[in-house]
UniProtKB/Swiss-Prot annotation:
Keyword Metal-binding: yes
GO CC terms in record: nucleolus; nucleoplasm; nucleus
Pfam families, A to Z: JmjC_2 (PF08007), RIOX1_C_WH (PF21233)
Positions that bind Fe cation: H302, D304, H367
Protein name: Ribosomal oxygenase 1
Reactions catalysed according to its record: N(6),N(6)-dimethyl-L-lysyl(36)-[histone H3] + 2 2-oxoglutarate + 2 O2 = L-lysyl(36)-[histone H3] + 2 formaldehyde + 2 succinate + 2 CO2; N(6)-methyl-L-lysyl-[protein] + 2-oxoglutarate + O2 = L-lysyl-[protein] + formaldehyde + succinate + CO2; L-histidyl-[protein] + 2-oxoglutarate + O2 = (3S)-3-hydroxy-L-histidyl-[protein] + succinate + CO2
Similarity comment: family membership: Belongs to the ROX family. NO66 subfamily.
Keyword Hydrolase part of the UniProt annotation: no
Organism of derivation: Mus musculus
UniProt EC number: 1.14.11.27, 1.14.11.79
Entry-linked InterPro entries: JmjC_dom (IPR003347), NO66-like (IPR039994), RIOX1/NO66-like_C_WH (IPR049043)
Modified residues (N-acetylmethionine): M1
SMART domains registered for this protein in UniProt: JmjC (SM00558)
Cofactor: Fe(2+)
Amino acid sequence: MDELPNGNGAALLKRGRGRRRRHPQSQPRGASVLALPLRPRKIRRHRKSAAASRVAALRARALRSEDSDSKVAVASVRGKRKRPAELLEASRSAEPRPVSARPRSASATLPSRVEGWAALSRNLGTAAPPPPGSHADEPGRPRASPLQQVLTELNGIPSSRRRAARLFEWLLAPLPPDHFYRRLWEREAVLVRRQDRSYYEGLFSTADLDSMLRYEDVQFGQHLDAARYVDGRRETLNPPGRALPAAAWSLYRAGCSLRLLCPQAFSPTVWQFLAVLQEQFGSMAGSNVYLTPPDSQGFAPHYDDIEAFVLQLEGRKLWRVYRPRDPSEELALTSSPNFSQEDLGEPVLQTVLEPGDLLYFPRGFIHQAECQDGVHSLHLTLSTYQRNTWGDFLEAVLPLAVQAAIEENVEFRRGLPRDFMDYMGAQHSDSKDPRRTAFMEKVRVLVARLGHFAPVDAVADQRAKDFIHDSLPPVLTDRERALSVHGLPVRWEAGEPVNVGAQLTTETQVHMLQDGVARLVGEGGRLFLYHTVENSRVYHLEEPKCLEIHPQQADAMELLLRSYPEFVRVGDLPCDSVEDQLSLATMLYDKGLLLTKTPLVPS
């Protein structure tokens, strides 16, 4: 399908393809959600009791479940039933909206790594929702798009975890998220048809892409790819250097699809969208944008190593999705090479995506896409869960477990039998030698003992540290900005700085800036707090950022991390002295990692 940011740098692997074919047969459009099944697959640090009791008292409330107002039918296709097809309707492509503000650069000199919600909402180019009590349908008043409405709603939700859950609920609506995770995630292709062309309005448009080409340093190969799929072959036609409008649009007119890698580096709204959702997944969330000319296909059939959510923004596109061809391709860990049409069977899903529609499919599902009927297509692919499997976790755990077992248990240091090569190895695989049976039993016993030595928490911390480094910097709500160092009224005025000197006291109530903004990790006998507030919107442009936490402040740091979103008095932090309490809280506040219950007043 498409290509997303990958482990190397710019994107998790993904593509987008299709091929000219006859129109799919029509079918009734009564169902708004279509789920297509794949065979399901099965898949410590010591803390003081005082700190633990405080955390128990400050335990965060559980998320409310929110029912969707929409009523939909859910259709499943199982076994070898006839593949679904959607009616290809003649409808106008979405007009690109005018850009009211120039997109931000992807360079290392971004003016602000942490930006406020209200400032980003202004980039949507649509009217803000009317205040309570006003007349939303007043003649002449532009209506806010569903996207801007939900972003405005998120700005009023104090918990970052609840914001992530709400935005994901909106993305799937009317499909309930709990049903999606329980029955469809990693198992089935899902189509959500909304019949609302404005649903994603303001997220990204062809006008945004044109503005980026004009005003930003967009480079072919690094930020933008030009590709086409003709006569069963994929071609990439990237010239060297900057992707100026004349070159990019000439390639588009020549039938090339344009793939924008890592649009979150340029688009504040895409950044905002992904920065919220990454907390929902607990895994890096990336994206690519694909603009495909009418009557063309940009990419060959293939599968990817990420969970893919396709958001149709403009125009229409015919998609064909195929099951993994054999069990080895289910939940694939690497992306496939390009396939020919002869490699494919019958699609399990054949449908035309319209603006506002959503398509999801798991890793290993082969897909291709093409534009037809003289209409272009613009879609954004959101990707996540690259190399985030049990196998990847165990791949990190087991070598460390073996190393620890060798050091701590003499049974792992005993020598192999002198004659083991006489009955072990491929040439002896059919041997009934009892020595072979004994050898295999010994291996099983030792492997079973490895669980005792497995450093599961240490590996979990390392993966959490990697996720912190992968993450986008946080986008702040108005409340988070006002109550953190980011909103202090310090400024230069009349020849001198004013409003300087705001200080925390033992009575100040604080909590972390957001839920997923930091992680405490032990390394080499020292403690470090890795955080996202100084990350770049460009993948791994910066080295991991961290603060060293003194051992006497470790329990206090853990309390702050675990008690979010409840407030804690600085004087209640489990430290040995008031000095330790204030120094920890002040360091975190000054770094932008902590917010207060009420604004600090400069002295």
